[in-house]
Amino acid sequence: MNRGPPNPRMFKFQPNPKVKNRFQDEADLRSLRSFKTDFSNYLASDTNFLNVAEIMTSYAYGESNNANEKEIQCDLLTENGGIEIDPTRLSYRERIRWHLQQFCYKTSSHGIPMLGQAPNSLYRAVWVFLLLICAIQFINQAVAVIQKYQKMDKITDIQLKFDTAPFPAITLCNLNPYKDSVIRSHDSISKILGVFKSVMKKAGDSSAEASDDGVEYDMDGITIQAKRRKRGAGEKGTFEPANSACECDEEDGSNECEEKSTEKPSSDNDMCICAFDRQTNDAWPCHRREQWTNTTCQACDEHYLCSKKAKKGTKRSEIKKEPCICESKGLFCIKHEHAALVLNLWEYFGDTEEFSDISTEEREALGFGNMTDEVAIVTKAKENIIFAMSASEEQRILMSQAKHNLIHKCSFNGKPCDIDKDFELVADPTFGNCFVFNHDREIFKSSVRAGPQYGLRVMLFVNASDYLPTSEAVGIRLTIHDKDDFPFPDTFGYSAPTGYISSFGMRMKKMSRLPAPYGDCVEDGTTSNYIYKGYAYSTEGCYRTCFQELIIDRCGCSDPRFPSIGGVQPCQVFNKNHRECLEKHTHQIGEIHGSFKCRCQQPCNQTIYTTSYSEAIWPSQALNISLGHCEKEAEECNEEYKENAAMLEVFYEALNFEVLAESEAYGIVKMMADFGGHLGLWSGVSVMTCCEFVCLVLELLYMAVTHHITQERIRRRENAANEF
């Protein structure tokens, strides 16, 4: 079979040096060299070529084809006069060289074959230079591609979907956490409210002194210059004389004293009599006891303010003599039965300094200190109540408002609700009993249409007459959240007042974030130490978990405003060390340069509800229906519900919703495409070319391994022969 002339570059005849030395003359050597160029001439010549058998007789054993010491290498002579070299018969180095040359001839990479086929050194140098330039340019581009990929950039796609949006969970709470009529039986709460009342009274006195403007008080045409005006003194109630501890300043000649109504006088010399109004808790004016005189007045008004003489022009028949008590100058008199007991203000206000069941350390633990700002005092009192009620959740539930007492009427999608089944109780430390609508995760609820008629409409009764003195506002706390999320009404809630219908229009947004390495969001589920068990992870819950861990570690107790960890007992309300430690670390965690930092990532999947709010007066005068559990006349019920009830509407403003999804801006596929594009542009290399290089490396490794194995076998045979 004629295979055609072989490529001359594929063959190189290299006689074994041992064979070369056996040639008898120079003519035989020249004939041997001519063998690689003209096989037919050599066969026809009369050259005295050594017989192979003659050579072989000098060896005691046969040689391996891979042996470096072999003196004869046999190559195939083709029919058309060419040589087809068997690479397995070449020496180790020649075999590697032969493989590299063959790779240069056959590779699909651009430029490399030009090196193997270069006719001279200059031609080869030019191609080496071109290959280096292209390789450098490719490396620069490859580095830029890799750096772009390592940035892990992402893009946010915004889509507006017109589909049925799931209705969220709605949490409803009374702004008053506990019923005043019930909670006062709690010993700790009774102490806290007593101290709170006293501190608020002192703060009011301080505010009144600070706002003194010398207002004149006029009675019967007689002007009295007031040294100070008490809080609420402009609102006249019913006055009566009352004993109080006082500080008197007699230098200004007015003989007027400053009352200290919450302090018990140490002696009779420190006691004075004041005109006291129970409605406003004002005690003014005050004078020493000896400056007041029991007498008879001719005119007293409905506020029990009297004058010794009747006004001019008053008929004798209209003059009514009333028992009264007047200060020495007779300018100020109060109606008073002489035999009646005089009220002691320190007993009326329940002087906190005289509490036999509360120690100094306990009072200090409450944290009121020298507070004079009423807003700050109320905030601290609310915190103290949370601490005092932290022991038993069952007790908190009983002292807070029950479900049917709060929720009177309800409808969803225009149909009545089942209050027992549709609302679930959640005990919140700040707001007491809260009730969640649409809590069941297995039941899908959605609005049929947009608008208030197809959302949640609920009427709530808060019973303002049973509010704690620390409850500053009357109304409802509402939180809109996903079913899987804890509501956090103290952080994310909205307040709705009584006497109004409050409308909350919603729009839903779904967020889908990328996890690492493109972002640092927390994937579905919760972290191992998340304190809100049974709820999905949220950033707020993470911060509270982090803070709770800090408090437990530093203070040895847990913050009662958050769920505890590992059964650790909450910090006690009257434990001074607990309260000071908690307050210290609460301030530290909020400092910019604080030593303790909480790192909380966003959840990868999150549903956000944006809300718009509007309100209108409710109920209207035309609403002549029986509201809730009111059994009075319609007008009376309307008035009662204006003060104690609120109407809420929660609905979708539109049935479409936004989907914000993050995606990788430059992923691995794009990187490989750009990488391959630059590789093909500058080097002409493809994936198949890379496979060629891989095969070359594998062949070279295989040759190296087999060579070392063969060498080891030869050494062993030689050692065995020598020993023999």
From Swiss-Prot:
InterPro entries named among the record's database cross-references: Deg-1, ENaC, ENaC_CS, Mec-4/10_cyt
Side of membrane Cytoplasmic, spans: 1-125, 706-724
Membrane topology: Multi-pass membrane protein
Any one biological process term the GO annotation gives: positive regulation of mechanosensory behavior
Entry-linked PROSITE patterns: ASC (PS01206)
Sequence ranges on the Extracellular membrane side: 147-684
Taxonomic superkingdom: Eukaryota
GO molecular function terms listed in the Swiss-Prot or TrEMBL record: ligand-gated sodium channel activity
Localization per Swiss-Prot or TrEMBL: Cell membrane
Chain positions carrying an annotated carbohydrate: N294, N370, N463, N605, N624
Entry GO terms, CC: cell body membrane; plasma membrane
Keyword annotations from UniProtKB, A to Z: Cell membrane, Glycoprotein, Ion channel, Ion transport, Membrane, Sensory transduction, Sodium, Sodium channel, Sodium transport, Transmembrane, Transmembrane helix, Transport
One protein family per Pfam: ASC
Principal location: membrane
Segments crossing the lipid bilayer: 126-146, 685-705
Record's subunit section: The channel is probably composed of at least the mec-2, mec-4, mec-6 and mec-10 subunits.
Function comment: Amiloride-sensitive sodium channel subunit required for mechanosensory transduction (touch sensitivity). Negatively regulates the turning step of male mating behavior.
Similarity section: Belongs to the amiloride-sensitive sodium channel (TC 1.A.6) family.
Protein name as catalogued: Degenerin mec-10
Organism annotation: Caenorhabditis briggsae
